[in-house]
């Protein structure tokens, strides 16, 4: 069997499809399209719609070179192929062509290129265009054009898509369909159904920073957190200053997302200190104002903590705004903004400290400043014994050694006693909650006797006499 016949046997269904197109393409005279059918099969083109302009021109030249046809016959046959192609394009892609015509984009030459590309991709409606289709178009353009031309084509491509989106959201079903909801897919910010936001992104040269890939292999929890943060930022922050929003939030969040995926981090609220330090090294290579960009860590944790349906007691940082505390527990002149547990690197100890803090914040009546002070001292104790399985396994001798070291430091007796009191309260909590059977130290053994300290605030006679003489001036 010849190679051509073998190929035809393998492509039988595709060849039959092509034949049906010619038979039903509006040209009844078989002799006008018979050669065209053979030509396309030889080119391994099995759909007349997919024949490029170059193919059509070469078909005409093939007819001329064969010497079998007059110029009139060549013109008739080459025209027949074009007419059949046009018939099937309008039959199968008429709605797409209409949508492109209605898109209010004036550059017909660029629209024609886009139209041919979409037809080759089997796109029947503009709403089928997504970032993946755009990426394929961009890759195709880069093979033929310089950067400036590629950007011109893509600008028209994006305008066509954006016009389609705006038309769709004029109806209720369209608005529902375009409602932002998390899906494992790529989100391209210029394709959002918010015209004001879309305008902000038009002049961003590096469009990659506008691509948010939620299809990539990563923790679903992380991806949902980033999606929530992205939408919160777009909807609520710097709507009137897109440059500031980009620099302070969008770019740093993009870097943070990439970092977490690479590091296999699955929870932004569980970021550890050493992970944050590694991320900072990456940021240092990207911007001069590192401090500005690093605020994305605290901003992200805060947004997630404040917007969660339920309080995230497991979070490494708690934000007091979430708790709606009574005024008598707050100091309005110097309010405590957050309680941090990230400094406790032993995770079991951190969980115990969070339980203790949860009790004080939720049930106890101490002021938040007082709670923070207690937690600060307990954190020092926990970090000292971070190598142990947990603070519950630390015995009396180990604690005695720790307390003796505290005594050796230049610490006032009153300060030392306060620390012992903070520690005993923490241990009492662990004991009551059943984390340990008995408290491994007796506070009275360590508490020191203290005396009220008198602060001499007397002033010299010369000074107070001068004050008395000048009182009349006040």
Q: Predicted regions: what is each one?
A:
Residues 9-20, 350, 450-474:
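Long, amphipathic, Lys/Arg-enriched alpha-helical "connector/arm" segment
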């Amino acid at each position: 069997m010849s190679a051509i016949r073998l190929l035809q046997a393998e492509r039988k269904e595709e060849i039959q499809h092509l034949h049906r197109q010619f038979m039903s393409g509006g040209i009844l005279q078989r002799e006008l399209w018979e050669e065209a059918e053979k030509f396309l099969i030889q080119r391994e083109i099995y759909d007349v719609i997919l024949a490029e302009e170059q193919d059509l021109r070469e078909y005409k030249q093939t007819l001329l070179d064969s010497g079998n046809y007059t110029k009139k016959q060549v013109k008739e046959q080459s025209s027949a192929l074009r007419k059949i192609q046009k018939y099937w394009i309008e039959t199968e892609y008429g709605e797409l062509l209409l949508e492109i015509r209605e898109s209010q984009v004036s550059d017909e030459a660029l629209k024609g290129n886009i139209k041919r590309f979409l037809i080759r991709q089997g796109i029947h409606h503009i709403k089928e265009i997504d970032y993946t289709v755009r990426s394929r178009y961009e890759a195709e353009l880069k093979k033929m054009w310089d950067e400036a031309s590629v950007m011109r084509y893509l600008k028209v491509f994006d305008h066509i898509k954006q016009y389609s989106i705006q038309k769709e959201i004029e109806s209720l079903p369209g608005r529902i369909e375009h409602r932002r909801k998390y899906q494992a897919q790529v989100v391209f910010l210029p394709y959002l159904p918010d015209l004001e936001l879309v305008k902000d992104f038009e002049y961003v040269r590096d469009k990659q920073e506008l691509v948010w890939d939620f299809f990539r292999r990563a923790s679903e929890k992380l991806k949902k957190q980033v999606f929530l943060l992205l939408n919160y930022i777009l909807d609520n922050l710097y709507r009137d200053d897109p440059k500031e929003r980009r620099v302070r939030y969008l770019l740093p969040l993009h870097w943070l997302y990439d970092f977490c995926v690479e590091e296999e981090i699955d929870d932004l609220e569980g970021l550890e200190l050493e992970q944050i330090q590694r991320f900072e090294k990456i940021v240092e290579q990207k911007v001069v104002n590192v401090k500005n960009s690093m605020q994305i860590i605290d901003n992200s944790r805060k947004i997630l903590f404040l917007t969660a349906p339920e309080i995230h007691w497991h979070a490494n940082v708690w934000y007091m705004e979430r708790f709606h505390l009574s005024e008598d527990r707050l100091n309005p002149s110097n309010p405590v903004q957050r309680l941090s547990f990230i400094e406790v690197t032993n995770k079991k100890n951190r969980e115990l400290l969070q339980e203790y803090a949860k009790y004080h914040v939720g049930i106890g009546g101490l002021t938040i400043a007082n709670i923070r002070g207690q937690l600060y001292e307990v954190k020092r104790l926990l970090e000292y014994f971070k190598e142990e399985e947990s603070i519950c396994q630390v015995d009396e001798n180990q604690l005695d050694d720790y307390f003796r070291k505290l005594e050796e430091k230049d610490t006032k007796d009153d300060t030392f006693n306060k620390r012992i009191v903070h520690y005993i309260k923490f241990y009492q909590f662990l004991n009551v909650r059943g984390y340990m059977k008995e408290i491994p130290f007796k506070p009275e053994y360590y508490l020191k006797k203290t005396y009220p300290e008198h602060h001499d605030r007397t002033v010299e006679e010369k000074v107070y006499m001068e004050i008395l003489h000048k009182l009349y001036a006040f």
